Regions:
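Oxyanion/phosphate-interacting regions
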Residues: 1-15, 19, 147, 179-184, ...
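Glycine-rich active-site/cofactor-binding loop and its immediate structural neighborhood
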Residues: 80-122
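Short, surface-exposed acidic/glycine-rich loop or hinge patches that mediate macromolecular interfaces
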Residues: 46, 171-172, 215
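N-terminal subdomain of lithium-sensitive/metallo-dependent phosphomonoesterases centered on the IMPase/IPPase/PAP
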Residues: 1-89, 110, 144-145, 179-182, ...
Length: 267
């Protein structure tokens, strides 16, 4: 599916609108509910989901939507060739901590691969998106846009640097991650970052690699996946396979590396 500029603009504004609704709750003592997997859920997650579902359904009424907050059974979605994959509030733990590192994620999946991704960080007022085969972009805004012409093209910037900037999860660190980094690199700095912003940091050349040895779901990474690819980066499983979407009943990803250059994962 080819997404024209006007449709992309509408989708970006849907993410911004949802993000602004999330900000309405940001300074409040929001009630927290814990799901079966012990992950937190707030009214901000639910309201963002309603806005995204409604907006995207109007923009592309014939494309189904799979959301973290409205899971759809495998029997229903297993034959989908095209669908929207959304995370209405990625980084709920960061939202609760009030550190600003949470995002709205929208991705379009076609034939098990992301072809469009939008990431909006409402507390930072920063929007990321790709244009298929023509790069990834960012634009600063806290209100709906009339045009995307003022966006800035971004790209990975790794060039055999001496100090490697390694990104880690702010809420999901583990020993495997620490050991891998120490064994792989001599001179490095680990920066903890929440949500899909880790993909954006690599995509705009602020970091080099994000090794993930803990659980993630497909809606956590799909938007960041295509933004990273279009900026010149890569995302591979730890056994060097491409990641695919909606190929099985569960939506868990394998452990993976998101990175700027192949040299970062070579033995």
């Amino acid at each position: 599916m080819k997404i024209d500029e006007n449709t992309l603009l509408q989708l970006c504004n849907a993410a911004i609108t949802a993000g602004n609704r999330v900000l309405d709750f940001y300074e409040l003592d929001t009630e927290i509910i814990y799901k079966k997997d012990e992950s937190p859920l707030t009214k901000a997650d639910l309201d963002s989901n309603k806005i995204l579902q409604s907006s995207i359904s109007k923009i592309t009424p014939n494309i189904p939507i799979l959301s973290e907050e409205e899971f759809i059974a495998w029997n229903t979605r297993k034959n989908w060739k095209k669908y929207w994959l959304i995370d209405p509030l990625d980084g709920t733990k960061e939202f609760i901590k009030k550190n600003g590192e949470f995002t709205i994620n929208i991705a379009l999946i076609e034939y098990n691969q992301p072809v469009l991704g939008i990431i909006y960080a409402p507390a930072l007022g920063c929007l990321f998106f790709p244009k298929k085969n023509s790069g990834s972009y960012k634009i600063y805004t806290k209100s709906n846009l009339d045009t995307l012409n003022n966006s800035e093209k971004i790209s990975v910037k790794y060039k055999n640097k001496e100090k490697i900037i390694v990104l880690g999860s702010r809420s999901h660190s583990n020993v495997t991650f620490d050991n891998w980094v120490k064994n792989k690199f001599t001179d490095f700095e680990i920066i903890e970052k929440g949500s899909s912003l880790k993909f954006c940091e690599i995509a705009e050349g602020k970091a080099d690699i994000y090794p993930r040895f803990g659980p993630t779901s497909e809606w956590d990474i799909a938007a960041g996946h295509i933004i990273l690819l279009e900026s010149g980066g890569k995302l591979k499983s730890i056994d060097n396979k491409d990641l695919v979407y909606n190929t099985k009943e569960d939506i868990l990803n394998p452990h993976f590396f998101a990175y700027a250059d192949d040299a970062l994962i070579k033995n």
